[in-house]
A protein has these predicted regions:
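Substrate-binding/active-site groove segments that recognize
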Residues: 77-103, 110-121
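Export/targeting segments at the very N-terminus of extracytoplasmic proteins
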Residues: 26-73, 112, 126-130
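Alpha-helical scaffolds flanking conserved acidic
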Residues: 60-66, 85, 133-141
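Secretory-pathway/luminal and periplasmic proteins that interact with or process carbohydrate-rich
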Residues: 29-33, 73-79, 122-125, 145-160
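Generic alpha-helical structural context detector
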Residues: 65-69, 88-92, 141, 152
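Periplasmic-binding protein-like
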Residues: 1-5, 27-32, 175-182
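Catalytic and substrate-binding regions of cell-wall glycan-acting enzymes that process beta-1,4-linked
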Residues: 134-199
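Extended ligand-binding regions for polar small-molecule ligands
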Residues: 1-28, 41-44
């Protein structure tokens, strides 16, 4: 009851409206501009980095480039609403844990190198997904939204009779449902609310 009273007293305040927009309405993506020239085989000024580090993890370099485009629009100075920085939008804590010195998150090579390392580690967390193309979908979702939310969606998929090792029409459906209270409060979920529409 106390929460309801607080809500009723604050629902029209500027701070409440700003929080609602930040967490529930605004897109968290950085607006996209143009890329260089796909027909000429040039996606960005960082193609050499994508090629180098994608090879180390066994990915097509264009997939790594598309992840960077989605995350930062190839802007090395980008900083997200949540504090993620640089070309690959590394969270500072993740960057530190992966060996990036403080202040170097926006260095393109550091960013791509650490992102590739993180993607490789994340892929190991989904090793039970045997099809490598299917596993990549889970890895990309975890990169964007966090492994915990993907694990929650997998648990929900299993609970509701879907295949927890298949993304399309299975786990992807439950990543979206994690924005609904009955799902994010389900006992199989450990990581709470997740909007999911950008994952």
């Amino acid at each position: 009851e106390v929460v309801n009273q607080w809500h009723d007293a604050n629902v029209t305040s500027p701070a409440y409206r700003a929080s609602t927009k930040r967490y529930f309405e605004n897109s968290k993506r950085i607006p996209h501009g143009s890329i260089l020239s796909v027909k000429d085989g040039k996606i960005s000024h960082f193609d050499h980095l994508f090629k180098k580090y994608a090879e180390e993890i066994g990915w097509d370099w264009r997939l790594l480039a598309s992840l960077a485009f989605t995350e930062s629009n190839f802007d090395t100075t980008a900083v997200s609403w949540a504090g993620a920085k640089g070309l690959m939008q590394l969270m500072p804590r993740t960057a530190r844990a992966m060996g990036v010195p403080e202040g170097k998150e926006q260095n393109p090579e550091e960013s791509v190198k650490v992102a590739a390392k993180y993607l490789k580690l994340t892929s190991r967390s989904f090793s039970k997904i045997e099809d490598p193309n299917e596993r990549i979908k889970f890895v990309l979702a975890a990169y964007n939204g966090g492994m915990g939310h993907v694990f929650d969606a997998m648990a929900l998929a299993e609970k509701y009779g879907k295949n927890k090792y298949v993304w399309d029409n299975n786990v992807a459906d439950f990543i979206l449902l994690k924005s609904k209270e009955e799902y994010f409060n389900d006992p199989v979920c450990r990581n709470g609310y997740f909007r999911g529409i950008e994952t």
